[in-house]
Amino acid sequence: MIKAVYPGSFDPVTNGHIDIIQRGAKIYDEIIVLVAENISKKPLFSLEERLDMLEHSLKDIPNVRIDHFSGLLVDYLRKINVKIIIRGLRAVSDFEYEFQQALTNKKLYPDCETVFLVSDLKYTFLSSSVVKEIASFGGCIKGLVPDYVAEKLYEKFGVKPKGV
């Protein structure tokens, strides 16, 4: 059984993330979507809220499970004996950062490999930050995130969606 880990903050999960997860689930026997507790980032949503949104968004993909971690990704990989990291690339600018991360992970855990999946063209502009900014002003985020996530965003910002 070949497993892969797809790490991220998922603050919140977007349809771009889900696209990468669905495609990864067709390649690997199991995908572990790993919510990072990154001390350098101040998330909008709590860990519990992010896990809840992922559970709702990924419930129809049978070979996906969700977990969370704090610390080095490679320590988590060793602990569960997984050697594959999936990362999505939206643009060339993503590659430079992701390549550096992949090399660092390889240095710390020589057995691990990072597999890059190129985003679907319709999601190349999409990021959690973009979605949060649009939602904070009540802008329409339909098609950018699952409906459940959109509800949670508008609720968090205390706004009603415009033009939906």
Swiss-Prot record:
GO terms for cellular component: cytoplasm. GO terms for biological process: coenzyme A biosynthetic process. The keyword Cytoplasm applies. Its EC number is 2.7.7.3. It comes from the Bacteria. GO terms for molecular function: ATP binding; pantetheine-phosphate adenylyltransferase activity. Its cofactor is Mg(2+). Belongs to the bacterial CoaD family. HAMAP family: PPAT_bact (MF_00151). This is Phosphopantetheine adenylyltransferase.
